[in-house]
């Protein structure tokens, strides 16, 4: 039975009791006037009874109304329940997201660890170079002390040939220290946002024998990805190798530019584990790509990397363009004699960015 029905029945019961009480009261009043001398006491009794019944009626109606309100409160409680479920669902999702974060942080930690390892190896390489330079300078000083000529007065006389030799040595040292300073922005730098488009890039060279030999050291690991050429760390073995002497790669630059020059870098024979750099690229060409790396190829120039020159060689583009390009394609036609693979260490692209940059 619903709360409303109970309330209506209670109200009808109250009206009937009131009518009966009124009728009885009227009859008693007449009786008290005509026949009953003790009418005041009876009237007070009926008043007590009526007050009690009225109080009980109000209590009953209030109880029924309270029950009805509780029944009508169910939809609101349902909405509250749904809100609680949604809140706990949101908390569960956030908790799961927090559980996933350590895995992502672990991957980031691995990358940072690899970068630290690469930097450490590069520091060791630079320390070796510094030791070599110190040895050269020490030999130069010893040579200066031991190769003075003396005149009849006992004063030292400098040998012109020896002075020229020392000057050449100093110039060589200064040249080696300056040769990596291109002093132009590199828009093919991975850390700046550049990337390799795999669909436009040759397959990497795979050599299980090389993997076993260099495992744990990192030299010429066939797992080296193509985007290694977009990173500044250059030391023996950290290169992208592709089969044979011909290959290509498509580079998405960090931003749109009007390209003006490119730079290719390789290690020198002095630091090569094999003692030669026959896997270095030789002839190569550069193209600009329009329309989001899928449009027409614009020829920018063809060049030769000289293995006997400096390790870092910059080439001015032979054909100027007037439109801003986002992608550059590098085609390599030959190497310096290696029969199995070509190894590319670093490739840079220079130019003028858009005015909005």
From Swiss-Prot:
Q: Which coarse location class applies to the principal site listed for this UniProt protein?
A: membrane
Q: Which residues form the SUN domain?
A: 193-354
How this chain sits in the membrane, per its record, is: Single-pass membrane protein
Task: Tell me where the transmembrane regions lie.
Answer: 48-64
| GO molecular function per UniProt | protein-membrane adaptor activity
Report which residue ranges the record marks as coiled coil: 98-146
**Topological domains annotated Nuclear:** 1-47
Location of the protein in the cell: Membrane; Nucleus envelope; Nucleus inner membrane
Matching entries from InterPro entries are given as:
SUN1-5, SUN_dom
Name the Gene3D superfamilies on file.
Answer: Galactose-binding domain-like
What cellular component GO annotations does this protein have? meiotic nuclear membrane microtubule tethering complex; nuclear envelope; nuclear inner membrane
Keyword hit for Zinc-finger: no
| Residues on Perinuclear space side | 65-357
Q: Keywords in UniProt for this one?
A: Coiled coil, Membrane, Nucleus, Transmembrane, Transmembrane helix
Which PANTHER family has this protein been placed in? Answer: SAD1/UNC-84-LIKE PROTEIN-RELATED (PTHR12911), SUN DOMAIN-CONTAINING PROTEIN 3 (PTHR12911:SF24)
Record text on subunit structure and interactions: Self-associates. Interacts with SYNE1 and SPAG4/SUN4. Proposed to form a spermatogenesis-specific LINC complex with SYNE1 during sperm head formation possibly implicating a SUN domain-based heterotrimer with SPAG4/SUN4 associating with SYNE1.
The domain-related comment in the record is: The short coiled coil domain is proposed to be not involved in load-bearing and force transmission from the cytoskeleton but in mere nucleus anchorage instead.
Role played: As a probable component of the LINC (LInker of Nucleoskeleton and Cytoskeleton) complex, involved in the connection between the nuclear lamina and the cytoskeleton. The nucleocytoplasmic interactions established by the LINC complex play an important role in the transmission of mechanical forces across the nuclear envelope and in nuclear movement and positioning. May be involved in nuclear remodeling during sperm head formation in spermatogenesis. A probable SUN3:SYNE1 LINC complex may tether spermatid nuclei to posterior cytoskeletal structures such as the manchette.
Q: State what protein this is by name.
A: SUN domain-containing protein 3
Whose protein is this, by species?
A: Homo sapiens
